[in-house]
Swiss-Prot record:
One of its GO terms (molecular function) is metal ion binding. It catalyses: a 4-hydroxy-3-(all-trans-polyprenyl)benzoate + H(+) = a 2-(all-trans-polyprenyl)phenol + CO2. Keywords: Cell membrane, Decarboxylase, Flavoprotein, FMN, Lyase, Manganese, Membrane, Metal-binding, Ubiquinone biosynthesis. It comes from Pseudomonas fluorescens (strain Pf0-1). This is 3-octaprenyl-4-hydroxybenzoate carboxy-lyase. It is a peripheral membrane protein. The gene is ubiD. Gene3D superfamilies: Single helix bin (1.20.5.570), UbiD C-terminal domain-like (3.40.1670.10).
């Protein structure tokens, strides 16, 4: 099922019993977090708070609170279908040369479809039905959540930030949290390696002292939102990828005050600039690790204009100790990652990011081992192949007889197939999430790889143990008489 905009998605979710309208007043200050957290942990529906205390704009929460709703948002009928999206991305990331004319002809429709999904720019857009400018701009009109009691201020969480570097042909989409610090100012918390920060740095180098145009879309359609957090190849824009997911071209509109193009059906658009050198201390905030992060300095985004649909919906979330929405997103997107990794490393049989590992800080890989040192090659490949795993602190590699998604299996492999000294790989001075206060230096820390595979000659001089396997014939005989044994 495909969705043309957020409202269409909300309507379809409600028809499926996957969305609940909350018609009593609930405050965006702490209360919505509590309601959403309980609902997410119970694998409950998306929530539309129709009467946020003190506001006229409804709040949509827990939208991607189950892997199934993430899959729906990406146009898939089930989580398992996300593997097909991963296969498409793997092909687009590194397309294989055709083996012949027939093979080339079979691949032609894919490239035709990609070309056909180039974004469509329109003039009259729903997101510009209402325009607020100048001194009338006031972010206090938005029911921005204060998620935790120790949070310093309200926090915009699902803003889709649109930027464009001076030397780039296409725009960058990124989701960065934004602390509200005034009527028309927020702090843009983007890390130095993220696309928005790179665009800003290039702008400052080419246009020193000049304001950097930025736009933020709130409440875009689900395909566009999820496209921004998916490992899309550099050769494919997030807008075009969203079109592939939606099976229809993404409609864009030029902003009123800059040349950036934003989703035409988004609920709310913030337009403005970042003045080079204008910085502010951001935080502390409770984040996806389950802790409050330390205060750090980031650029200030000045909002010059707000445009929105008539009767807009404000899309929001919270982050905290897993499970939270980012963790659920990680569970679903895990299925997209597997084919991409397998394209580069065919020996990988499964890849799993445990949600309790904060979505990306730990990975478990199962593989068909073929030679001594093979597991170490795979773990180094995981760290280096996709940008999404540059912050993964722990990689556990096991044989393919282990279920990567069953901790009983994984712990058994670690404790029976590993020597702590021989089979542990430590790498120092690597990129680490700035939110990781356990690292000795902000943004720089170590990584650990655990080789929990069977050891080959050359890796050990000892006779390796054989796994105990039950006798199939005996198992079948006992199955046949089990009910007669009277064992409950």
């Amino acid at each position: 099922m495909k969705f043309k905009d957020l409202r269409d998605f909300v309507q379809q979710l409600e028809q499926r019993g996957e969305l609940k309208r909350i018609q009593i007043p609930v405050s965006p200050v702490l209360e919505m977090t509590e309601v959403c957290d309980r609902t997410l942990r119970a694998k409950g529906p998306a929530l539309l708070f129709e009467k946020p205390t003190g506001y006229d704009i409804p709040v949509l929460g827990n939208l991607f609170g189950t892997p199934e709703r993430v899959a729906m948002g990406m146009g898939a009928e089930s989580v398992s279908e996300l593997r097909e999206i991963g296969k498409l991305l793997a092909f687009l990331k590194e397309p294989e040369p055709p083996k012949g004319l027939k093979d080339a002809w079979s691949k032609l429709p894919i490239f035709r479809k990609i070309i056909a999904m180039a974004p469509k720019v329109i003039k009259d857009a729903p997101c510009q039905e209402v325009v607020i400018e100048g001194d009338d701009v006031d972010l206090a009109m938005l029911p921005v959540q204060t998620c935790w009691s120790g949070d310093v201020a309200p926090l915009i969480t699902w803003g889709l930030t649109v930027t464009k570097g001076p030397n780039k042909d296409r725009q960058n989409l990124g989701i960065y949290r934004q602390q509200v610090i005034g009527r028309n100012k927020v702090i843009m918390r983007w890390l130095s390696h993220r696309g928005g920060a790179l665009d800003f740095r290039e702008w400052c180098e080419k246009h020193p002292g000049q304001p950097f145009p930025v736009s933020v879309a709130l409440g875009a359609d689900p395909a566009t939102i999820l496209g921004a957090v998916t490992p899309v190849p550099d050769s494919l824009s997030e807008y075009a990828f969203a079109g592939l997911l939606r099976d229809s071209r993404t409609e864009l509109v030029k902003c009123r005050g800059n040349d950036l193009q934003v989703p035409a059906t988004a609920e709310i658009i913030l337009e403005g600039v970042i003045h080079p050198g204008e910085m502010a201390d951001e935080g502390p905030y409770g984040d996806h690790t389950g802790y409050y992060n330390e205060v750090d300095s980031f650029p200030v985004f000045t909002v010059e204009r707000i445009t929105h649909r008539i009767k807009p919906i404000y899309h929001s979330t919270y982050t905290g100790r897993p499970p939270d929405e980012p963790a659920i997103l990680g569970v679903a997107l895990n299925e997209v990652f597997v084919p991409i990794l397998q394209k580069q490393f065919p020996e990988i049989t499964d890849f799993y990011l445990p949600p309790e590992g904060c979505s990306y800080r730990m990975a478990v890989v199962t593989m068909k081992k073929s030679y001594p040192g093979h597991a170490k090659r795979v773990m180094l490949g995981v760290w280096s192949f996709l940008r999404q795993f540059m912050y993964t602190k722990f990689v556990i590699v096991t044989d393919d007889d282990i279920n990567a998604r069953d901790w009983n299996d994984v712990i058994w492999a670690i404790t029976t197939r590993m020597d702590p000294k021989r089979d542990t790989v430590m790498i120092d001075n690597t990129p680490i999430d700035y939110l990781d206060f356990a690292s000795p230096v902000s943004g720089l820390g170590s990584k650990m790889g655990l080789d929990a595979t069977h050891k080959w000659p050359g890796e050990t001089t000892r006779e390796w143990g054989r796994v105990i396997v039950k006798d199939d014939a005996v198992t079948q005989r006992i199955d046949a008489i089990w009910n007669q044994l009277g064992i409950d």
